[in-house]
Amino acid sequence: MVAAKKTKKSHEGINSRLALVMKSGKYTLGYKSVLKSLRSSKGKLILISSNCPPLRRSEIEYYAMLAKVGVHHYNRNNVDLGTACGKYFRVSCLSIVDPGDSDIIKSLPGDQ
């Protein structure tokens, strides 16, 4: 029960930081634009939902490894990631280009 509470707390922290990025920062949503941001070395952090297809996930992780960018696996599905972004559609992956006022890049355990 304590572990469930801790994960809920951490989701709230990630969601609030993500909302701040959506307000004050720059980001790209979607698979193709995430790959573009990785190839052009603009992305600082990548978030991938839990139900992102394995082939897409591995391709994003490969490009992120080449670009030396951190990848965070969001523990919820793409509907919840879209809701956390304040969107009314599903988001399987997103790239944070400029975090703005948020400290999400320092706070999330990415592979940096």
From Swiss-Prot:
Keywords: Ribonucleoprotein, Ribosomal protein. GO terms for molecular function: mRNA binding; structural constituent of ribosome. It comes from the Eukaryota. InterPro entries: Ribosomal_eL30-like, Ribosomal_eL30-like_sf, Ribosomal_eL30_CS, Ribosomal_eL8/eL30/eS12/Gad45. PROSITE patterns: RIBOSOMAL_L30E_1 (PS00709), RIBOSOMAL_L30E_2 (PS00993). Disulfide bonds: none annotated. One of its GO terms (cellular component) is cytosolic large ribosomal subunit. NCBIfam families: PRK01018.1. Belongs to the eukaryotic ribosomal protein eL30 family. This is Large ribosomal subunit protein eL30z. It comes from Arabidopsis thaliana (Mouse-ear cress). The lineage of its organism: Eukaryota, Viridiplantae, Streptophyta, Embryophyta, Tracheophyta. The gene is RPL30A.
